[in-house]
Amino acid sequence: DEHGVDPTGTYHGDSDLQLERINVYYNEATGGRYVPRAILMDLEPGTMDSVRAGPFGQLFRPDNFVFGQTGAGNNWAKGHYTEGAELIDSVLDVVRKEAESCDCLQGFQITHSLGGGTGSGMGTLLISKIREEYPDRVMLTFSVCPSPKVSDTVVEPYNATLSVHQLVENADEVMVLDNEALYDICFRTLKLTTPTYGDLNHLVCACMSGVTSCLRFPGQLNSDLRKLAVNLIPFPRLHFFMIGFAPLTSRGSQQYRALTVPELTQQQFDAKNMMCAADPRHGRYLTASCMFRGRMSTKEVDEQMLNVQNKNSSYFVEWIPNNIKSSVCDIPPKGLKMSACFIGNSTAIQEMFKRIGEQFTAMFRRKAFLHWYTGEGMDEMEFTEAESNMNDLVSEYQQYQDATAEEEGEYDEDEDDEGGDYA
């Protein structure tokens, strides 16, 4: 939509800016047809069939649909070790093919869920394989975590914990999403009575588009995935971000709000706008990044960022001064004058890991459902490792939430302990 490409891949836009960097996400095929550089993989054919039958079915390259026949049955071990491992080579072939057609490959964007078997098990397998082959490229994931109240399957805590274990090691940036938080935004802010998955996806799209807008359109203050990582990750393991988007308004109340930089700033820092089930008011921001789109002055953006930090200084750790990065892209999304996308690295994300960890422990103590995983060749040790890795992550977040600028000196010598001793 933003680039003026219709569902058959033909360009129908009205501005050269749409085409200027269209190659970031599209390959140009014969007859001026634009093909997205996307690979779709699953362990069962059903989802692919529905994509093919959907409105954008003709857009994707048929070779880039890679699927198995069996399905992972919500089993992480099947996705990561047995079924997924059989399919992964054919996926990697397609990845190589796509990577070779890039002039300057910056990184990979992966969208997957952490609750099921394929997205979590095979998704993390793909991430680790890509990591082996392209160690210096940015690995950005959009990971849909199990929601606190809504649960599709009973083994979600297992799959999610095993996945987080992998994401801590192999991903560079993880944008944490959560269906329930997305539902709440649709329900409360957008006033939709019965939100569909389409509505939820629309919110995620707005964010994905915001994160990558600077790669695709010219701007005054550019940013890319690598700059994002450099500015948002103070310690390599703490790369789980919450994302938000502004302006989100219901259809009826649009004309009551002004689209100004202060208004956008206020809305994107609003806790109700976060797309994952963690409340930033319960923690502190280590860093944050605001990506504005539209015609606005960079001076105004900088003033607002300073303003936020001065007024809410207790919500930002004091040992990282000016920890909000901002970028400005000139072209707003379709149908809006200006918009903003927010990415925050907040210690409050530990709430989510804590919650999953508690659910994990409750089941793992009784070895519930474990035979499904051991039957695929997994070892109980892996579960224990994943559990302790997640607990370490939580205590690291807690440690940096409590750390003050004065205490830094005492901690320097035992930094290597991964925050285990004084959590």
UniProtKB/Swiss-Prot annotation:
Protein function: Tubulin is the major constituent of microtubules, a cylinder consisting of laterally associated linear protofilaments composed of alpha- and beta-tubulin heterodimers. Microtubules grow by the addition of GTP-tubulin dimers to the microtubule end, where a stabilizing cap forms. Below the cap, tubulin dimers are in GDP-bound state, owing to GTPase activity of alpha-tubulin.
Binding residues for Mg(2+): E44
Assembly: Dimer of alpha and beta chains. A typical microtubule is a hollow water-filled tube with an outer diameter of 25 nm and an inner diameter of 15 nM. Alpha-beta heterodimers associate head-to-tail to form protofilaments running lengthwise along the microtubule wall with the beta-tubulin subunit facing the microtubule plus end conferring a structural polarity. Microtubules usually have 13 protofilaments but different protofilament numbers can be found in some organisms and specialized cells.
Protein name: Tubulin beta-2 chain
Species lineage: Eukaryota, Sar, Stramenopiles
Residues covered by region (Disordered): 394-423
GO cellular component, one term: cytoplasm
Matches recorded under InterPro entries: Beta_tubulin (IPR002453), Tub_FtsZ_C (IPR008280), Tubulin (IPR000217), Tubulin/FtsZ-like_C (IPR037103), Tubulin/FtsZ_2-layer-sand-dom (IPR018316), Tubulin/FtsZ_GTPase_sf (IPR036525), Tubulin_C (IPR023123), Tubulin_CS (IPR017975)
Family, per entry: Belongs to the tubulin family.
Alphabetized UniProt keyword annotations: Cytoplasm, Cytoskeleton, GTP-binding, Magnesium, Metal-binding, Microtubule, Nucleotide-binding
Positions of GTP binding: E44, S113, G117, T118, G119, N179, N201
Cofactor: Mg(2+)
SMART domains on file: Tubulin, Tubulin_C
PROSITE patterns: TUBULIN (PS00227)
Compositionally biased intervals (Acidic residues): 404-423
A single GO BP: microtubule-based process
Protein's cellular compartments: Cytoplasm, Cytoskeleton
GO function terms (MF aspect): GTP binding; GTPase activity; metal ion binding; structural constituent of cytoskeleton
